[in-house]
Amino acid sequence: MPTVDLYNIEGQKVGDLQLAETVFAVEVNEDVLHQVVVAQLANKRQGNQSAKTRAEVSGGGKKPWRQKGTGRARQGSIRAPQWIHGGVVFAPKPRDYKMSIPKSMRRVAMKSALTSKVNENELVVLESLELDAPKTKEMVKMINAFEGKKPLIVVPESNEVIYKSVRNIEGATVVPVNNINVYDILKHDKFIITKEAVSKIEEVYA
């Protein structure tokens, strides 16, 4: 069972915390991680790109000049792709990029992502994270104490005070524990999470 240090908001060690082996010490499945991240990014795409083909642009019904005898290259329409204002060849059209991932695969990916953070010493567990009022300065001090440049800060539930304290810090993101996803975990260099949020993760994934 992996054991990690437990810190306060000042970055001082205040104890140890044992993590569930079935969540934070599994075999990292990079293939599944890749598939889930690709699916998440695909699902974020709007898919509303669109351009007109030569059949859709206006005009061009008349042949611009006769076929032979002008000395110029033959042309059939001023809306052919080689003309200015002509239609687009293989024009992109709105489409749905959504990909579905089985629940079992999402669970494997989440456990693999969490384990990778433990293996790479990028997991920081806080005893608690509470502020009386929004204080960006306090959050900057905490992030610097753990040498984080792009931290993902995970709290037990939505917290407006913490959110306002972090929103102006470049690279930092705050999410409630029930909104974490594999892509966010992997793209941030530090995974800062409260002890209570760890317990909630273990309840779901253990």
Swiss-Prot record:
GO process terms (BP): translation
Function noted in UniProt: One of the primary rRNA binding proteins, this protein initially binds near the 5'-end of the 23S rRNA. It is important during the early stages of 50S assembly. It makes multiple contacts with different domains of the 23S rRNA in the assembled 50S subunit and ribosome.
One Gene Ontology MF term: rRNA binding
Keyword Ribosomal protein: yes
Name assigned to this protein: Large ribosomal subunit protein uL4
An annotated GO cellular component: ribosome
Entry-linked NCBIfam families: rplD_bact (TIGR03953)
Keywords noted in UniProt: Ribonucleoprotein, Ribosomal protein, RNA-binding, rRNA-binding
PANTHER family: 50S RIBOSOMAL PROTEIN L4, LARGE RIBOSOMAL SUBUNIT PROTEIN UL4M
Family membership: Belongs to the universal ribosomal protein uL4 family.
Positions of region (Disordered): 45-76
SUBUNIT field: Part of the 50S ribosomal subunit.
Database matches in Gene3D superfamilies: 3.40.1370.10
Listed InterPro entries: Ribosomal_uL4 (IPR002136), Ribosomal_uL4-like (IPR013005), Ribosomal_uL4_dom_sf (IPR023574)
Database matches in Pfam families: Ribosomal_L4
